[in-house]
Amino acid sequence: AFELPALPFAMNALEPHISQETLEYHYGKHHNTYVVKLNGLVEGTELAEKSLEEIIKTSTGGVFNNAAQVWNHTFYWNCLAPNAGGEPTGEVAAAIEKAFGSFAEFKAKFTDSAINNFGSSWTWLVKNANGSLAIVNTSNAGCPITEEGVTPLLTVDLWEHAYYIDYRNLRPSYMDGFWALVNWDFVSKNLAA
């Protein structure tokens, strides 16, 4: 059975940008519910023996939605860290500059893409098979690992449960908080993978 992975930080570690109350609901209830539902759907089937990634790449409907949301949320938590944010360095900085011209330009494009990503959704920075970087929007449980050769580097959760307690309907303010928490070390590990 799949388990809810431990958060890589304490429940209050992302304050004031993301509150403990948000994490209690977002991680403790929403993320956990996806895990519980996925286990209920795959129990007693051949999918129970597969990895989360295999299930995401080969399933549809409720199984896909719950598996992808488990994966997406775990990835998102790792994209965040207390006392993080700022600008990337090294290979990540170089790759972003090559793709977008500058970090400021990338940040503006990613933020604009996230703010205008309609409904329950995710915005991603991905590395394509040819090594180029791109900003990709997915709807609902959409997950870039379903695309051959695409490696997710960074994501922001744009479902309302990610920000409504702290920011109400102000997605741009949530994005300001997101940039203060980006874990560039995790992005760097993904880029090197």
Curated annotation (Swiss-Prot):
UniProt binding sites for Fe cation: 26, 73, 157, 161
Cofactor(s) recorded in Swiss-Prot or TrEMBL: Fe cation
SUPFAM superfamilies: Fe,Mn superoxide dismutase (SOD), C-terminal domain, Fe,Mn superoxide dismutase (SOD), N-terminal domain
Cofactor binding annotation: Binds 1 Fe cation per subunit.
Record field: catalytic activity: 2 superoxide + 2 H(+) = H2O2 + O2
Known partners and oligomeric status: Homodimer.
Matching PANTHER family: SUPEROXIDE DISMUTASE, SUPEROXIDE DISMUTASE [FE] 2, CHLOROPLASTIC
Function: Destroys superoxide anion radicals which are normally produced within the cells and which are toxic to biological systems.
Name of this chain's protein: Superoxide dismutase [Fe]
Native organism: Photobacterium leiognathi
